């Protein structure tokens, strides 16, 4: 069995030659082993007397050439696509130069409709001699600028409202502090006035008032006098510092 393997290797080297053997080695290093094995066919012809002969087909070299061409085409396509993308990016980054008539027409259309459907976009692009994509980008930028301006106006209005409310809050806080201080002082004075006792020595009955009350009771009718006698009379209190006119 070992002798047969050596014969197979010797026959392979003789059939390919030095150049073919080198080419096969390079192809085996680059191509997968499964693909190379599938392209190699071993045949045992009957007339050879049982001696194995290896026939290497040209599909190996042809497959390598096709694979190389495919890789080259793919690399070429990738480079061309990248260059096209770069050109498109450069063109898109260029600022659109519009004439006064074009700008005026775009502004009028924007005032009528802030957004355009595809048909309106194409018609306006033809009228302005522009591409539909350029018209779409202009409308997008115009909407963004309008929204930014409205946001700035709203921010300024809210800022003023915030300042007004802050000042009103401070004023109300000062008024609240003043009311609290006034309420505290009033409550303290009322508490002092109600809690201080009145000395009993300062209260006395005026003698003249008592005499007048007795004379009025004597000159009244008996029933009225009886009613007065039945009802207790409240004592008249006066201050010793205030003298009566009768006294």
Curated annotation (Swiss-Prot):
Q: Which cysteine pairs are covalently linked by disulfides here?
A: none
What is a single cellular component term in the Gene Ontology annotation? nucleus
What keywords does the record list, in alphabetical order? DNA-binding, Homeobox, Nucleus, Transcription, Transcription regulation
What domain of life does the native source organism fall in? Eukaryota
InterPro entries referenced in this protein's UniProt entry, alphabetically:
HD, HD-ZIP_Homeobox_LZ_Class_II, Homeobox_CS, Homeodomain-like_sf, Leu_zip_homeo
Q: In which tissues is it expressed?
A: Expressed in seedlings, stems, leaf blades and panicles.
* Stretches that traverse the bilayer: none
Please indicate if the UniProt record lists Transcription as a keyword: yes
Keyword Glycosyltransferase belongs to the record: no
**Which GO terms label this protein's molecular function in UniProt?**
DNA-binding transcription factor activity, RNA polymerase II-specific; sequence-specific DNA binding
Please give the residue ranges the record annotates as the region Leucine-zipper: 149-193
Q: Which SMART domains match?
A: HALZ, HOX
Q: Which residues bind DNA?
A: 91-150
CDD domains from the xrefs? homeodomain (cd00086)
Q: Where in the cell is it found?
A: Nucleus
Composition skew (Low complexity), residue ranges:
32-44
Chain segments carrying region Disordered: 1-44, 221-247
Show the Pfam families listed in the entry. HALZ, Homeodomain
List, alphabetically, the PANTHER family matched.
Answer: HOMEOBOX-LEUCINE ZIPPER PROTEIN HAT14, HOMEOBOX-LEUCINE ZIPPER PROTEIN HOX15
Which family does the UniProt entry place this protein in?
Belongs to the HD-ZIP homeobox family. Class II subfamily.
Per its database record, what is this protein's job? Probable transcription factor.
Q: What is this protein called?
A: Homeobox-leucine zipper protein HOX15
């Amino acid at each position: 069995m070992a002798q047969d393997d050596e014969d197979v290797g010797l026959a392979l080297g003789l059939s390919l030659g030095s150049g073919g053997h080198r080419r096969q080695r390079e192809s085996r290093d680059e191509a997968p082993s499964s693909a190379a094995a599938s392209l190699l066919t071993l045949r045992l012809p009957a007339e050879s007397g049982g001696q194995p002969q290896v026939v290497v087909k040209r599909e190996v070299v042809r497959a390598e050439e096709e694979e190389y061409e495919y890789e080259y085409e793919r690399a070429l396509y990738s480079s061309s696509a990248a260059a096209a993308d770069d050109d498109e990016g450069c063109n898109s980054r260029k600022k659109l130069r519009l004439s006064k008539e074009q700008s005026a027409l775009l502004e009028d259309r924007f005032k009528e409709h802030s957004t355009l459907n595809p048909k309106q976009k194409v018609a306006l692009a033809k009228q302005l001699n522009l591409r539909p994509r350029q018209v779409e980008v202009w409308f997008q930028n115009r909407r963004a600028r309008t929204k930014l301006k409205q946001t700035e106006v709203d921010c300024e209005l809210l800022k003023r409202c915030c300042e007004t409310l802050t000042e009103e809050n401070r004023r109300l806080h000062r008024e609240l502090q003043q009311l609290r201080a006034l309420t505290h002082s009033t409550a303290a004075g009322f508490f002092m006035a109600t809690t201080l006792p009145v000395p009993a020595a300062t209260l006395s009955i005026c003698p003249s008032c008592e005499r007048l009350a007795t004379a009025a009771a004597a000159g009244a009718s008996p029933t009225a006098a009886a009613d007065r006698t039945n009802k207790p009379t409240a004592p008249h209190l006066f201050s010793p510092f205030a003298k009566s006119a009768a006294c």
